[in-house]
Amino acid sequence: MKVLAIFTCFNRKEKTKKCIETIINGNPECNFTFVVSDDGSTDGTYEMLQNMQAVYSIRVLRGEGGWFYSGGMSVGMNYALKQFPHGFDYLLMVNDDVEFFEKSIQNMIEQSILQKDTVVVGAMCNNGGELSYGAVKYITGYKYRKMKLSEWKTPADTFNANCVLVPYKAFEKVGAMDSYYRHSLGDFDYGLSLKRAGYLLCQSKEFVGICNNNSSKGTWTDTNLSRIERLNKKENVKGAPIKQWFYFLKKNFGLGLAIRGIITPYIRIILG
């Protein structure tokens, strides 16, 4: 199987290298090409990726620090659509901080084939073996929950894109991640777009790698910070800036929920 893997990186040289090598070496039945959006790394990541091109099939795109996660993914996916029309069986969206297990991608491909070209969301566990990221199911409105491994036959609504296998024809139909997003929400939005286009999304049958949960410490949800600090962090590009949050909610849930949704975070901050 020919797989095009896309990810964004910034100043995680060793993790980036390990991610690429683990994916390739752990899935020998797959033929991988990588498109990597390096968002202005200063730790030698970009130069390392250039050197790795002598061994692996890697295209490196160079940013200047303003892409962030979703922006970098959008750039990489748009590049792939232009450079590689109809050239692959699958698109693989990954995060470079995932420690992948052996044959994890091959197993996801087998599951996708058995489930008739399903989008397979790779479930992540933390160091304690507990679910950390993966497929998502909405409960009511925009409130959601993480899906369990045992629910792999249950259709998902969207995903955290730590590792997502998308049939290439679905990628070509839906297109790239929405360029409006800079850091967060881009992956959730993309999953919802795939679902709207008629594609089935499912959780992987087993954990495909280790990726620990991001800590809330120092973020806008950290109640130990002052209200002003939380407000500033919320409107930061890596927080939940109001314009992007409103855009996401309106696009996917309608104007009514969007208006309610943009007010809720401020109430949380005020109430502490």
Each language-model region and where it sits:
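Conserved donor NDP-sugar-binding/catalytic core segment of glycosyltransferases
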Residues: E99-G134
